[in-house]
Curated annotation (Swiss-Prot):
<feature type="active site">
    <location>
        <position position="70"/>
    </location>
</feature>
<dbReference type="Pfam" id="PF07910">
    <property type="entry name" value="Peptidase_C78"/>
</dbReference>
<comment type="function">
    <text>Thiol protease which recognizes and hydrolyzes the peptide bond at the C-terminal Gly of UFM1, a ubiquitin-like modifier protein bound to a number of target proteins.</text>
</comment>
<dbReference type="GO" id="GO:0071567">
    <property type="term" value="F:deUFMylase activity"/>
</dbReference>
<dbReference type="GO" id="GO:0006508">
    <property type="term" value="P:proteolysis"/>
</dbReference>
<keyword id="KW-0645">Protease</keyword>
<dbReference type="InterPro" id="IPR012462">
    <property type="entry name" value="UfSP1/2_DUB_cat"/>
</dbReference>
<keyword id="KW-0788">Thiol protease</keyword>
<keyword id="KW-0833">Ubl conjugation pathway</keyword>
<keyword id="KW-0378">Hydrolase</keyword>
<comment type="similarity">
    <text>Belongs to the peptidase C78 family.</text>
</comment>
<feature type="active site">
    <location>
        <position position="196"/>
    </location>
</feature>
<feature type="active site">
    <location>
        <position position="194"/>
    </location>
</feature>
<protein>
    <recommendedName>
        <fullName>Probable Ufm1-specific protease 1</fullName>
        <ecNumber>3.4.22.-</ecNumber>
    </recommendedName>
</protein>
Length: 234
């Protein structure tokens, strides 16, 4: 289903008044961490995210969120991608600012601000809608490797070359999907950017070597239901 009614359902006057302040990170965030990743097979067809983004991960801004903040980090990477695609000079919200937005639109109660409560793909869409008025399509995938879901992802990358935020029920770890590869033999891989890294990444290759940026065969996602947020940024 397409989720496109955040402002109508909640009203965004309070959220619109929130100011996203400039950030001073302790070290430069890596850009386009997937840029050094080679395709998983020779030949076949590869579709990837168009446009750059910053790699947000656990603790990258000094906020210690290991164990619960992965959804926020995937959202921050997604927002940095939207801003670049739009040519915007806006700032990426902090975890606390994301929480304040969700409270302002009525999705969460006041106690949510400053908590360690995680967020999922629907909350990620709400924040994207408030900040950038970009529609998203939410897919509920009982089986990620089904022909229907893989067809949706292929069509999405063909049309938008976009950025997908994904989270699961059994596999609760949030991650970004930034590419789709079909081998010459028809095996499907998804390009995953994983925000669970802790520390200071020295390079793109560092993340690739540790497995935080990788191509994953879709059959490895078996056993969990997933929700996917497909950002419909032209």
């Amino acid at each position: 289903m397409a989720a496109e009614k955040c402002a109508e359902e909640f009203g965004d006057s309070s959220a619109a008044s929130l100011k996203i302040v400039p950030k001073d990170y302790a070290y430069p965030l890596l850009e386009d961490p997937q840029g050094a990743l080679t395709t998983p097979t020779e030949g076949g067809r590869t579709l990837v995210t168009r446009g750059g983004f910053n790699y947000f991960h656990y603790g990258c801004d000094g906020h210690q969120d290991a164990g619960w903040g992965c959804g926020y980090r995937t959202l921050q990477s997604a927002i940095s991608w939207i801003q670049r695609r739009q040519g915007s000079s806006g700032h990426v919200p902090s975890i606390r600012e994301i929480q304040q937005i969700l409270v302002a639109i009525g999705d969460k109660g006041p106690e949510f601000v400053g908590s360690r409560d995680w967020i999922g793909t629907l909350e990620e869409f709400y924040v994207i809608d408030v900040l950038h008025q970009v529609p998203c399509k939410i897919l509920h995938a009982k089986e990620l490797s089904s022909d229907e879901i893989l067809g949706e992802l292929r069509s999405y990358f063909e049309k938008y070359q976009g950025f997908v935020a994904m989270g699961g029920l059994s596999d609760t770890a949030s991650k970004a999907i930034t590419g789709y590869h079909c081998s010459a033999r028809g095996r499907i891989f998804l390009q995953v950017v994983d925000p669970h890294f802790v520390g200071v990444p020295s390079s793109r290759q560092h993340l690739i070597d540790l497995g935080y940026v990788r191509w994953v065969p879709v059959d490895e996602f078996a056993g969990s239901t997933y929700n996917l947020c497909l950002i419909l940024q032209p």
